[in-house]
């Protein structure tokens, strides 16, 4: 669901706030609606500032002239836009220190009990065991997003009562990884039909 607020930055603007950076901003005097969806733990101030400082000053009351060249350029850019993968190397000799070893976790908001990693040529398979005993695997690709579906609930930064009530899976996850140093591997998971992302 969304909360509805008066939106600072422009008189008469109204915004609907969803969790983790879901915004619907109505700028009534410009007959304009801006929709943003992202997975951020911030308050969205920087993103909204782009609307006020960059987008809004370019808005005019008269229709834009047809510009086929710019429209074709926009289409070309849209065709290649993608979520950037984690940057780094595909492998590290240090991986043998973690290969197939169980990492016990302390209490955490995700309900995860332990993690285990298996390293392939250009893939990391993360096995998650929840405190309930439920286990599932998340694949992470190198220079690509590996996707899978899962029946487990995705991580959520807030814990309202019954936050998943009435919601059914599967939830789709896209994972990317890279070794950012000899001893550090970074995993990034985006829950593509949910509102959260996770970096480890």
Language-model regions, residue ranges each:
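Charged/polar, low-hydrophobicity segments characteristic of intrinsically disordered regions
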Residues: 1, 64-67
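Active-site Gly/Thr loop motif
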Residues: 1-36
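N-terminal, helix-rich and Lys/Arg-enriched segments in bacterial and organellar proteins
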Residues: 34, 63-64
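A short acidic/small-residue loop/turn micro-motif
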Residues: 40-42
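Surface-exposed amphipathic alpha-helical segments
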Residues: 49-63
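Peripheral terminal and inter-domain segments
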Residues: 68-200
